[in-house]
């Protein structure tokens, strides 16, 4: 009886420390047919039936913990579980295209590494791990993470994202006839009209910094990317306008928003502040 009682006390303490925390934590996710991946996360003060989930997708720097730290400060008073997967460079060099192609346009043949549906797999894992009742999630990505976000919402089977922010992407998959990854011609997986309709009818906020106009080695200069505009600012504007034209021509439902963040260049911290006003709106506070 003494052993059982001590065991129950220890178990309770372990559960309590897991469910009540404001510190960054990490797990190694291996429940798929791809290389294992580090996932950083931060639990709210207390998980309740109103706890929401926000995924934070890093840029090409791959510093998922740094991105999460920015959002921990922004969401410090909110009942939200923050999750930041780390797509390391060695295992997922082209995470920004969902591992479906290189940035120069060459299609990757190993479909086992494709990252469509990955976020929803993580979503289900965290829902089960912490006994959450979340039916959907929100997602933010900056730079390469912004590329990931919009392609993920386009090419995944049935993403449960209720709201998304794609900020300062270097280039896009336009909804026109250019070959994938620059357009939707000949994608490496099936892409139907239902995918496109759902994509356009998802609340996606395209954010671009007013000063994100610098062209350097970090900006994709391939022919396919340059056809989208000279810099990130032009490409974001053109991406949104092409989508708007398609919606008007085909009388489709459209929930996208376009926002210029004044004074911001290629800065995740500044774009995160703007995104937080969108994603944290109406969330429960402590």
Report each predicted region and the residues it spans.
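N-terminal signal peptide c-region/cleavage motif recognized by signal peptidases
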Residues: 16-18
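Short glycine-enriched nucleophile-adjacent loop
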Residues: 146-157, 275
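C-terminal catalytic histidine-bearing segment of alpha/beta-hydrolase fold enzymes
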Residues: 237-286
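Residue in the alpha/beta-hydrolase core beta-strand immediately N-terminal to the catalytic nucleophile
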Residues: 136-138, 163
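Gly/Ala-rich beta-loop-alpha elbow adjacent to hydrolase catalytic centers
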Residues: 139-141, 145
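Serine-hydrolase catalytic machinery in alpha/beta-hydrolase-like enzymes
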Residues: 27-43, 50-136
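The feature captures the conserved acid-bearing segment of alpha/beta-hydrolase catalytic domains
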Residues: 162-165, 169-248
């Amino acid at each position: 009886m003494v052993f059982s009682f001590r065991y129950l006390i220890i178990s309770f303490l372990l559960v309590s420390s897991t469910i009540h925390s404001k510190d960054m934590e990490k797990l190694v996710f291996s429940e798929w047919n791809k290389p294992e991946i580090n996932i950083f996360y931060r639990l709210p003060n207390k998980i309740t039936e109103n706890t929401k989930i926000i995924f934070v997708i890093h840029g090409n720097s791959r510093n998922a913990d740094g991105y999460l730290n920015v959002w921990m400060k922004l969401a410090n008073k909110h009942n939200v579980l923050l999750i930041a997967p780390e797509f390391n460079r060695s295992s997922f060099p082209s995470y920004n295209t969902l591992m479906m192609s290189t940035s120069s346009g060459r299609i990757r043949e190993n479909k086992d590494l494709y990252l469509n549906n990955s976020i929803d797999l993580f979503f289900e894992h965290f829902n089960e791990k912490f006994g959450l009742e979340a039916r959907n999630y929100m997602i933010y990505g900056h730079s390469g993470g912004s590329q990931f976000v919009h392609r993920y919402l386009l090419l995944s089977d049935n993403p449960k994202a209720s709201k998304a922010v794609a900020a300062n992407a270097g280039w896009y998959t336009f909804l026109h006839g250019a070959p994938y990854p620059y357009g939707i011609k000949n994608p490496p997986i099936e892409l139907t009209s239902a995918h496109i309709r759902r994509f356009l009818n998802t609340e996606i906020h395209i954010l671009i910094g007013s000063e994100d106009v610098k062209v350097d080695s970090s900006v994709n200069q391939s022919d396919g990317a340059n056809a989208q505009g000279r810099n990130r600012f032009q490409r974001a504007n053109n991406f949104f306008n092409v989508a708007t034209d398609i919606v008007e021509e085909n009388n489709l439902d459209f929930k996208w928003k376009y926002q210029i963040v004044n004074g911001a260049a290629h800065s995740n911290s500044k774009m995160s502040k703007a995104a937080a006003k969108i994603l944290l709106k109406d969330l429960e506070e402590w």
